[in-house]
Each structure stands twice: as structure tokens, then as C-alpha cells.
Swiss-Prot record:
Keywords per UniProt: Ribonucleoprotein, Ribosomal protein, RNA-binding, rRNA-binding, tRNA-binding
Gene that encodes it: rplE
KW Ribonucleoprotein (keyword) present: yes
NCBIfam families membership: PRK00010.1
Entry protein name: Large ribosomal subunit protein uL5
Complex and partners: Part of the 50S ribosomal subunit; part of the 5S rRNA/L5/L18/L25 subcomplex. Contacts the 5S rRNA and the P site tRNA. Forms a bridge to the 30S subunit in the 70S ribosome.
Alphabetical list of SUPFAM superfamilies matching this protein: RL5-like
Length: 187
């Protein structure tokens, strides 16, 4: 069992139950899944970019990535329906906690001038989106062997009813949010 999952089961659940005044342990918010998406714009002109993106995303996630294809044709982008345009992977269970652990303790501290992740990434339903500009912050990716620096989007889906519950959960798990601006502290 990963350290993060063990900490969630033994410490975080109990503190959330007390702090949120929940009546049942089933109402405690938890992380349901993590979706990692990598869009590859160069895939329109060269198919090898998608193959390298799939390989690198599979190394980062520890699970085989799936190629995503265009739903519609867009002439201005020289895009045809069904063309590969990126890849994604959905993590659940043990692999999800392992990835989250590596993200929090290894990858995010390697970001240049890191001051925390933005607080505005919540969608209103208790889910959090985080964009990463360089996939090379993960230790699985060698900067010398990659053909181009790619960005990726990480979506953390929780069972929380609202953004405040989700923010509390993710802060307790250990996601390093930026300090709240002075105007938000009074709210």
C-alpha cells in the first residue's frame, strides 16, 4: 500500500469527518480517479509525435496510454475526423495513489520557480485541473532522449460535492496550493 493511501485511510478520513461535520463515513470525499491527457499539435503533420507521446505518457503513468482521435474535421487546422491528436490515461486505485505521490513529492518540486499550484483549477463540481508545461519534470522522462518538450493536463476527480470540500481534501492529501491572495483570506 502506498504511503499516501495509508495516510488517507488512517488520518485524513477521520479529520475530514470531524471538520466537515459529516454524518456518515460514506459522505467523506475521496479521490476517485486521475486522468492525464497530452494533446500533441504536431501530430497533424507527423504521426511519430503521437507514438512518442504515448510512450512517454505510459512511462509517466505506469500504465499504457490510449490514443485520442479528432471528433470533427477542421479545415483551418488541416485536421480530419479520426486523426490521432493526443493520448490519455485514466488511473484508479493503487496506481492513482502512486502517481499522486510522485507528482507531489518529486515532480512538482522540480518545476522552475515553483510557488504552489493555482487555486483556480476547480470546476465547480469538486474536480481539479492542473496544467503542466514540461513533461520532463517527471523522473521517468530523460530530457536528452525526448524529441520535444510536451505539456500535459492532469484532472483529479473527487467525490466531493463542491470545490471547498475538494480543496480541503486535496490540501490534506498534500497538494501544495499557492498561498491565498489577501483579498480571498477575508472571505
Amino acid at each position: 500500500m502506498s504511503v499516501l493511501k495509508d495516510r488517507y485511510e488512517n488520518e485524513i478520513k477521520q479529520s475530514l469527518l470531524k471538520d466537515m461535520n459529516l454524518s456518515s463515513t460514506m459522505a467523506i470525499p475521496k479521490i476517485e480517479k486521475i486522468i492525464i491527457n497530452m494533446g500533441v499539435t504536431q501530430a497533424v503533420t507527423d504521426k511519430k509525435y503521437v507514438d512518442s507521446a504515448v510512450e512517454e505518457l505510459s512511462q509517466i503513468a505506469g500504465q499504457r496510454a490510449v490514443v485520442t482521435r479528432a471528433k470533427k474535421s477542421i479545415a483551418n487546422f488541416k485536421l480530419r475526423q479520426g486523426m490521432p491528436i493526443g493520448c490519455r490515461v485514466t488511473l484508479r486505485g493503487e496506481r492513482m495513489y502512486d502517481f499522486l505521490e510522485r507528482l507531489i513529492f518529486i515532480a512538482l518540486p522540480r518545476v522552475r520557480d515553483f510557488q504552489g499550484i493555482p487555486r483556480r483549477g476547480f470546476d465547480g463540481n469538486g474536480n481539479y485541473n492542473l496544467g503542466i508545461k514540461e513533461h520532463t519534470i517527471f523522473p521517468e522522462i530523460s530530457f536528452d532522449k525526448t524529441d520535444a518538450v510536451k505539456g500535459l493536463n492532469i484532472t483529479i476527480v473527487t467525490t466531493a460535492d463542491n470545490d471547498d470540500m475538494a480543496r480541503t481534501l486535496l490540501e490534506r492529501v498534500g497538494l501544495p496550493f499557492r498561498a491565498a491572495p489577501k483579498s480571498q483570506e477575508n472571505k
